[in-house]
A protein has these predicted regions:
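Short, small-residue-rich loop/turn micro-motifs
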Residues: 43-47, 139-141, 209
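Radical SAM enzyme core and accessory elements
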Residues: 1-33, 259-297
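Structured helix-beta-strand junction loops
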Residues: 78-79, 105, 130, 170, ...
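Conserved alpha-helical substructure of the radical SAM core
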Residues: 13-122, 129
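Canonical radical SAM enzyme core domain
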Residues: 60-71, 89-134, 139-146, 152-159, ...
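Radical SAM enzyme [4Fe-4S]-AdoMet core and its adjacent flexible, acidic
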Residues: 149, 154-290
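Hydrophobic faces of well-ordered beta-strands that scaffold small-molecule active sites
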Residues: 39-41, 82-84, 109-111, 135-137, ...
Length: 297
């Protein structure tokens, strides 16, 4: 039995304490003054999976109201990437309406999903017709059922593969995401990368480490350098050939051919690109807000 850390309301580690202090030193913003290119919106905390790694495992938090969300979307600076997350955002029956509200406000709608509902192609088509432009598809086990069981507590490779195929068939831009867990799925980066290369709708591959937030597998998390080594070993790409875009202490962003690759040692504190909509209608730095409100919202 793999050791899991139970959800809790507050992080009393030095890292958690420093993050809470960091949040207090960051301003929050009115939506119309949002400086972040991406705003992450927790549209529901319900989920249809019980993954071993989940930064917000609290399922009792009520959904944000669609009308209120539309009002927030209308205030954001035009061209914002509005990323709808959960829980699992596809559990909202009004997800197409939320996507339309984002498009009507002249933004880019993005859905971050585990992909289970997107195994249904008519549903994917409905979201595309509503205006969905980009999907971030979680593939922690690539296409291997046993890896999904080990990381996400469910054998779901067939549905994940079908979701991947449906997004390609519906020509929806897709980012493939994987949480890389030490000694479990490092080798799965190779088939993930191969799939990204063969599907023209895939624009990005994002590998991240396990974050010690919420519920997580209690084993040493991969460092940023280790993530890079996992990637280069799996792909056969030499580190000195990577076309670097940006590197910080916790993230590495580069281009490899037509694909953008992001490596993130989670959490990426101090990120200047991602904000989070708070229940009060303000925009806060994403990672700082998640940690300072661990176990809640």
């Amino acid at each position: 039995m793999r050791s899991l850390k139970k959800p809790h309301q507050a992080d009393h580690t030095a890292a958690g304490a420093s993050a809470a202090v960091a949040l207090s030193t960051y301003p929050t913003y009115k939506p119309e003054n949002c400086p972040f290119e991406t705003v992450i919106v927790d549209v529901t905390h319900r989920c249809n999976m019980g993954c071993h790694n989940c930064y917000v495992p609290n399922r009792s938090i009520p959904d944000l109201e669609a009308k209120w969300l539309a009002e927030i979307f209308a205030k954001l600076p035009p061209g914002t990437f509005v990323r709808l997350v959960g829980g699992e955002p596809t559990l909202r029956e009004d997800l197409p309406e939320l996507i339309r509200a984002i498009r009507d406000a002249r933004h880019h709608p993005v859905v971050l999903t585990n992909g289970l509902k997107m195994a249904d192609r008519p549903y994917v088509r409905e979201l595309r017709r509503a205006g969905l432009q980009i999907v971030y598809l979680s593939l922690n086990g690539a296409f291997d059922d046993e890896l999904y069981l080990a990381i996400d507590a469910m054998r779901c490779a067939e549905r994940k593969t079908q979701a991947f195929d449906n997004l390609r068939a519906e020509h929806i831009f897709t980012s493939l995401g994987m949480i890389v867990v030490r000694d479990i799925n490092e080798h799965a980066v190779k088939p993930l990368w191969k799939a990204a290369q063969t599907a023209r709708n895939v624009r990005e591959v994002h590998l991240r480490s396990v974050g010690a937030i919420g519920r997580y597998q209690a084993r040493p998390s991969l460092t940023l350098d280790e993530l890079q080594e996992v990637f280069t070993t799996a792909t056969g790409i030499q580190p000195d050939t990577l076309a670097q875009r940006e590197r910080t202490n916790s993230s590495y962003d580069f281009m490899q051919g037509r694909l953008r690759v992001q490596l993130t040692q989670w959490p990426d504190l101090g990120s200047e690109t991602r904000g989070r909509l708070t229940p009060e209608g303000r925009i806060a730095p994403f990672f700082e807000h998640v940690i300072a409100n661990e176990g809640g919202y």
